[in-house]
Design a protein with these regions (language model features):
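Glycine- and acidic-residue-enriched helix-capping/strand-helix junction motifs
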Residues: 16-29, 33
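Active-site nucleotide/adenylate-binding loops and adjacent lid/helix of ATP-dependent enzymes
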Residues: 1-13, 25, 41, 56, ...
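Conserved dinucleotide-binding and phosphotransfer motif residues
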Residues: 37, 83, 111
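A generic structural motif
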Residues: 36-42
């Protein structure tokens, strides 16, 4: 952020996702770096306050250090855009597409980008979930990666 017209920076960190600890660490590192570069830094943690309490009159730009659900999936970005506040991060649609593994997978396949075989288990199927049958039916084999559809930071 070399543009000094963005002097007052709000670092949004923490949140309520399973990646809260990662977000807090990222946010703290950002705060330290911004202060060192002489930016006026304030913080906001959506775990304790709703995003609608952001006072846009007191900030020039939002540094989005949220990780996971609501931070990387387009939710926070859409609210920042609603407030008409510039922010760091990809936009709403890009964030959603990147965070949702099924959407990403579909985009890769449609654009002929090589990607490993996969199988998605939906909540309704969990009762009857039989890994051995799925492996045989889908011709999958170990090693496997099992992850939630919309979390990052290697949670899963």
């Amino acid at each position: 952020m070399k543009n000094k017209k963005f002097k007052r920076v709000l670092v949004v960190l923490g949140g309520t996702s399973g990646e809260r600890a990662v977000s807090l660490n990222s946010g703290k590192a950002c705060i330290k770096a911004l202060i060192k570069k002489k930016y006026l830094v304030s913080t906001f943690d959506p775990k304790f306050k709703n995003l609608n309490l952001i006072d846009k009159r007191k900030i020039d730009v939002i540094f989005n250090a949220l990780h996971g659900k609501d931070g990387e999936d387009g939710v926070a970005q859409s609210y920042f855009e609603y407030l008409n506040i510039p922010y760091t991060h990809s936009g709403v649609i890009s964030s959603y597409n990147a965070m949702n593994k099924l959407v990403s997978k579909d985009l890769f396949i449609k654009n002929k980008i090589l990607t490993p075989k996969f199988y998605s288990v939906h909540r309704a199927e969990k009762k009857n979930y039989n890994l051995k049958k799925i492996l045989i039916k889908k011709k999958l084999h170990f090693p496997l990666v099992i992850k939630p559809i919309n979390q990052g930071s290697s949670l899963g």
